[in-house]
Design a protein with these regions (language model features):
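Glycine-rich beta-strand-centered segment in the early N-terminal region that forms part
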Residues: 29, 76-81, 138-151, 165-209
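C-terminal hydrophobic helical "lid"/dimerization subdomain
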Residues: 7-19, 25, 30-38, 42, ...
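Short hydrophobic alpha-helical membrane-entry/anchor segments
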Residues: 97-111
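Short Gly/aromatic-enriched secondary-structure transition segments
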Residues: 157-167
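Adenosine-nucleotide cofactor-binding segment
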Residues: 284-354
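Glycine-rich phosphate-binding loop and adjacent beta-alpha segment
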Residues: 347-429
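NAD(P)H dinucleotide-binding glycine-rich loop of Rossmann-like/cofactor-binding domains
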Residues: 46, 53, 57-66, 73-74, ...
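Mid-domain Rossmann-like dinucleotide-binding core that forms the NAD(H)/NADP(H) cofactor-binding site
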Residues: 244-316
Length: 466
């Protein structure tokens, strides 16, 4: 009996609460409905409807352009109506943008996949190895890759310091930000990723605004990876994609190719870096005379890669471009100058280009490959909101015209599948070989990053999952 009484009491309470909620909703609706502005709007609509009906009866078209124009002019002369419409439009715009942003965030969440080890970053730039990180499942056009090794370079330090953070926030990326180039094996293929199959050995790049490759399981779009050369092990393969893509992008900016590069004089500063080693090999392969600016302990390696001139950097630290300018005054200026992130590159941009370049060199003959803050990272708060709205609007426009919802257009052509296939072909033909420096374990990532950014590094530093 007590239980039955308690049940009836609970039902009665629920009924009373429901009736009270309905009553409050009715009161709120009546208050809004009888508000002065709403009542005035209803009166205007009713008057316009009566006038339209009367005009139909009289045989006059109710939707005459002249009549509509007169009505709009009369409305816009009403200050209260203008203020009400402005508030309505602002509320609709803010609410619509918030709804679209929330929908995009919720729609970007992929289904949870398996757990694996990954390096997660924190706001204080520390990197922690997580043993059970959740990996998103492979969606349409994506592949799930078991990462065997990934590279550590100066771009990782730039990402830890905030490079690409605005784009990462807009894309809803997870916390993993380190690991740029990677090599692994395909474990799962999503719908539409027909170019790859299970078990394919692949390599690829992860930009600073992407999740990063420092995870044992990685989900990426199939257009951002390609099959790696079979002759390369995972360690050597992971050292080449990011550095090779950066080198190809720099040569594309200079519009250099095997047909027009022969006989040109090119200076590569910081040639001991991963991208510097690739540039030296490609330029020497295409017939250019390559001068390198690097520490003395890297001289033999760079000469073996094809360098013809060596500018010694004592101690690896250079505060200005004076050593290179002095060498140019003795041996002659260059057709192009490439500044890499390795030891020997001055921290400041080139100012006296006339002392380094030939008079016939184009204006863009100085290419800086070092990571610098993106424009989206430097915008103040009002402009960052405008950038976010423009970014989402552009994505929606691309989706409406049938270009898809992906963000492949953010990547350079050299870091996507066509550029990676070009690197693989050069390796298979024996024209390009990776320069592997040291190999570390995931728990030693901070040591690996410190070595990769030091003056002692020659080539690319790699971290391998055991």
């Amino acid at each position: 009996v007590t239980a039955a009484g308690n049940g009836r009491a609970k039902v009665h309470d629920i009924t009373q609460h429901s009736l009270e909620a309905v009553r409050k909703i009715k009161e709120a609706f009546n208050e809004i409905w009888h508000h002065e502005l709403i009542a005035e709007s209803r009166a205007r609509i009713a008057a316009f409807a009566r006038d339209a009906v009367q005009r139909v009866k009289d045989g006059t078209p109710p939707l005459s352009p002249v009549l509509l124009y007169e009505e709009l002019v009369a409305l816009f002369k009403d200050r209260v109506w203008r203020r009400s419409m402005a508030l309505f439009l602002m509320g609709a715009m803010c609410g619509g943008c918030a709804g679209v942003a929330l929908g995009l965030r919720l729609g970007a969440r992929a289904a949870a996949g398996p757990h694996a080890r990954a390096l997660h970053t924190h706001h204080d730039q520390t990197v922690v190895l997580v043993e059970d990180a959740v990996t998103p499942a492979a969606g349409a056009g994506e592949v799930l890759i078991r990462v065997q090794a990934f590279s550590a370079c100066c771009a990782d330090r730039a990402a830890l310091r905030g490079r690409g953070s605005a784009l990462r926030a807009l894309l809803g990326r997870p916390a993993v930000t380190v690991g740029r180039g990677f090599a692994g094996v395909v474990l799962d293929v999503g719908l539409g990723a027909d170019a790859l199959e299970l078990g394919d050995e692949v390599w690829g790049c992860a930009a600073e605004w992407a999740p990063g490759a420092a995870a044992e399981l990685l989900t990426v779009r199939s257009t951002l990876v390609s099959k790696r050369p079979r002759a390369l092990a995972a360690d050597a393969a992971a050292s080449l994609p990011w550095a090779g893509a950066a080198a190809l992008a720099a040569l594309q900016r200079l519009q250099y190719d095997p047909e027009n590069c022969k006989g040109k004089r090119v200076a590569v500063c910081g040639a001991g870096s991963g991208e510097g080693c690739v540039l030296v090999q490609l330029l020497s392969l295409w017939g250019a005379s390559v001068a390198v600016l690097a520490p003395r302990h890297a001289a033999l390696t760079l000469q073996d890669l094809g360098a013809t001139e060596f500018v010694d950097v004592e101690g690896g630290h250079v505060s200005s471009w004076e050593p290179l300018e002095q060498h140019a005054s003795r041996r002659g200026p260059w057709d192009a100058v490439l500044a890499c992130s390795g030891a020997g590159t001055p921290p400041t941009p080139v100012e006296n280009t006339a002392a380094l370049l030939k008079s016939t060199a184009p204006r863009n003959a100085v290419v800086d490959l070092r990571p610098s803050p993106l424009l989206s990272d430097r915008l103040p708060a009002p402009l960052s909101l405008l950038f976010a709205a423009s970014f989402y609007s552009f994505r929606v426009l691309r989706w409406m015209v049938g270009c898809g919802w992906h963000t492949d257009w953010l990547w350079s052509h050299a870091s996507r599948a066509p550029g990676l296939e070009t690197l693989a072909r050069l390796v298979d033909e024996g024209h390009l070989r990776p320069v592997l420096d040291k190999v570390y374990l995931p728990q030693e990532f901070e040591t690996a990053l410190a070595h990769a950014c030091s003056d002692e590094a020659i080539g690319t530093t790699v971290v391998r999952f055991p």
